[in-house]
Structures are given as C-alpha cells and as structure tokens.
Amino acid sequence: MARGCLCCLKYMMFLFNLIFWLCGCGLLGVGIWLSVSQGNFATFSPSFPSLSAANLVIAIGTIVMVTGFLGCLGAIKENKCLLLSFFIVLLVILLAELILLILFFVYMDKVNENAKKDLKEGLLLYHTENNVGLKNAWNIIQAEMRCCGVTDYTDWYPVLGENTVPDRCCMENSQGCGRNATTPLWRTGCYEKVKMWFDDNKHVLGTVGMCILIMQILGMAFSMTLFQHIHRTGKKYDA
C-alpha cells in the first residue's frame, strides 16, 4: 500500500514538474522572441540598463526550466542528489522571495522615492543617441496607460523645453501635438498610473502569488518525501 502511494507521489511530482518545465520553456521562448523582435524596447531605468522586459522573462524562464528539469529527473530516476538539489533551489527561491517582500514593505517609501528619481533621470536620455529603447518604452507606456511623465506631464519640460511633451502624452495623438500648448494632455503621471493598476488588481496578484507559494511548498514536500523514502530503503522501488 505504502509503495503504491509513493509510486503515485513519484509520478505526480514528475507530472507537476513536467508542466513546470514546459512553462519555463514557454517563458524562455517568449523572452527570446521579445529580445529579437522588440530589440529596441528596453528599460526605463538608466541605473539598470539590462533590466528590460525581455531579459526579465528570459531569466525567469531559465530559472523555472532548470528547476522543473531537476524535479522531473530527480523524481523519475529516484535520484537523491537531484531531489535534494531541487529542494534546495526551491527553498532558496522561497527565502529570496520572502526577504525581498519584507524589504519592499519595510522600505516602501524609500523605494518609491528612489524609483521616481531614477525614472526622472531616465527621461533626460529620451532624445540621446543609443537610447532608442528607452524612448520606445516611454512612448508605449504613455499611450497604453494614458499618462504623461513620471509624476506628471511637467517632468518633460526640463527635457524637451517649456510647454513641450512627447506626442504620446496627447489625448488625441497627432504629429507635433506635444508642442501645442492648447492640446489636451494626459495629466496623471505614469508612476501613479502603475500604482493604481497594481491596487486595482491586488486581489488577482495576491491569488497568483498564493498559488505560486503553494506550488513551491508542495514541490518541496514531495521532493523531501521521496528523498526520505529512498534514503531509508537504500534502493529504488519498482514503478
């Protein structure tokens, strides 16, 4: 009976991690596609030039894919080393997530202040050479989120000149509309808009975060259960 339950657990863990691995492959593929097809779409931050959407997706996809591979192989081969490695990787990821979450809430005001400062410094690079990605990023987010600047539209004045904003700040976008002082503009800053989006979707984001946490804990529990069984018996059990 116990052997049958453990066999079931073994294949459940394999299937669970196979799905995990496939998701990682999908994310990696999307990240590479973004990097190739949207090469000019970069980060908003001059302090972290490599922190683009494509690079983030590639990094997350790689971590998920490697973790899923360790879990799949460790479960199907009943390999103690791989199962332990899988457990440690999940534990490190879980601890890192908790530490980052705690630090974020403890230093939230400082994070907001530094983020706004860094984004405003990035605006100064809007029309400079070799920063087409940053320009495209600002144009897209301002058009999609109906916002202008970091805190408000006046953030653009030191960059583009008095009473001048990018055309994407106009409520009705047209060539040169940002130079017309009478043109209706999106008044809300993009930083505030992003915060509003997170606030509006906090329940969905919280649910997703809880699901990820449960999956990590289940993965750790499954791997340690198999590890302990193999360690006690000192041999593989028949599938």
Swiss-Prot record:
Found in a complex with GP6. Belongs to the tetraspanin (TM4SF) family. Glycans are attached at N180. The chain crosses the membrane at residues 14-34, 56-76, 86-106, 204-224. The keyword Glycoprotein applies. It is a multi-pass membrane protein. It holds the Pfam family Tetraspanin. The keyword Transmembrane helix applies. Glycosylated. The lineage of its organism: Eukaryota, Metazoa, Chordata, Craniata, Vertebrata. Residues 1-13, 77-85, 225-239 are cytoplasmic. This is Tetraspanin-9. Keywords: Glycoprotein, Membrane, Transmembrane, Transmembrane helix. InterPro entries: Tetraspanin/Peripherin (IPR018499), Tetraspanin_animals (IPR000301), Tetraspanin_CS (IPR018503), Tetraspanin_EC2_sf (IPR008952). It comes from Homo sapiens (Human).
